[in-house]
Each structure stands twice: as structure tokens, then as C-alpha cells.
Amino acid sequence: MAQLYFYYSAMNAGKSTALLQSSYNYQERGMRTVVYTAEIDDRFGAGKVSSRIGLSSPAKLFNQNTSLFEEIRAESARQTIHCVLVDESQFLTRQQVYQLSEVVDKLDIPVLCYGLRTDFRGELFVGSQYLLAWSDKLVELKTICFCGRKASMVLRLDQDGRPYNEGEQVVIGGNERYVSVCRKHYKDALEEGSLTAIQERHRHI
């Protein structure tokens, strides 16, 4: 019986790599997969999922207006789909998460979603909120902070490397960069206004 999966993590935990490996595992057995990624994120080129270790795969794009259930139903009528995989699933709307649950429940196609749980403010993305609520299986993909603890938070740094937690939730292609850290060092960095100073102190412990 098909299920809806949500693989979630902080940034740079290998979500895209895990998605590409799952897709490959299906294809290796002669099964057909359909891969989606968010139209909003084209850092590695539009229409593909790319991992930091150099793997990539063509992908369909979704935006807030994409009717995922109708697209997948039409596609599966033409040719059997054995699995749907969604990268950057934090950018899904509530309705799209519901549509993916319909793909599972009505079309009996497994759906594997990969995404961030929280944003740089420590708040849930809408897509992640409903995936956490409605998925059959939740899997945390772990990465570590510079201190060795599990990294569960994402810091946004400005062009001068200073952490901040105000502004738009989604900024693609700006001068900002993001770093995954543990909760303690997320709070410490925001309080001090510097991640570098905290990292330097930690090196000398």
C-alpha cells in the first residue's frame, strides 16, 4: 500500500542526494519515477534536482498554482508511475500537500517529499507544517553543527556574515547565505550578532 513520506532536516543534510538515490533505486528495478522541484529555486539550473556531490536529475517544476494531483493523474494514465519524489517540499502549499496525499490514497502511488522543517526564524514552512501533520512516515535526515551537536536550526547570514532573523522567509539568489547549527548556537549567534566569534571560541576550547 502506498504511503506519503516526509524526509526533513536542516540545510546541507543531503536531502537532494537522498532523493536522487531513492529515484535511482526505483529506476534500477525498471520502475518509473517522476521528480518535482520548486520553480522558485533555480540556483543549480531550472528543471533539475542537483546535489552538492555532483548528482543531478531532470525534474518537473511546481509553483503555487501547480495542480499536482491532476498532473500526476494525467501522467500516470499515459504511463505507469511507480513513485513521485518532491524536492524543496517546504515550498508546497497546504492544498498541494493535500493533493499529494490524494496521489497516495486515490492513485496508490508512493510520494516521497524532501525539505526543510523550519526557516531561519525557527518557524515552520507551510509545506513542512502540513507534511508533518499528514504524512504516513516522518524521517529526520541529520546533519551536525560545528560543535558536533545535531544541527536542527538554520541561520541566515548577511553579506558581512552577521546573523539575523528578520525579513522575507524566502530569498533566493541574494547575498545571504545559510548555515545549519544546533539550537544553542543559533540562539547564541543571534544574541551576539556574530557566528564567527562563537566558532573561534569553540575552536579554542
Swiss-Prot record:
ATP binds at S9, A10, M11, N12, A13, G14, K15, S16, D87, E88, S89, Q90. It catalyses: thymidine + ATP = dTMP + ADP + H(+). GO terms for biological process: DNA biosynthetic process; thymidine metabolic process. Signal peptide: none annotated. The lineage of its organism: Bacteria, Pseudomonadati, Pseudomonadota, Gammaproteobacteria, Enterobacterales. GO terms for cellular component: cytosol. Pfam families: TK (PF00265). The active site is at E88 (proton acceptor). Belongs to the thymidine kinase family. The keyword Transferase applies. NCBIfam families: PRK04296.1-3 (NF003298), PRK04296.1-5 (NF003300). Gene3D superfamilies: 3.30.60.20, P-loop containing nucleotide triphosphate hydrolases. GO terms for molecular function: ATP binding; thymidine kinase activity; zinc ion binding. InterPro entries: P-loop_NTPase, Thymidine_kinase, Thymidine_kinase_CS. It is found in: Cytoplasm. Keywords: ATP-binding, Cytoplasm, DNA synthesis, Kinase, Metal-binding, Nucleotide-binding, Transferase, Zinc. Zn(2+) binds at C145, C147, C182, H185. Homotetramer. Its EC number is 2.7.1.21. This is Thymidine kinase.
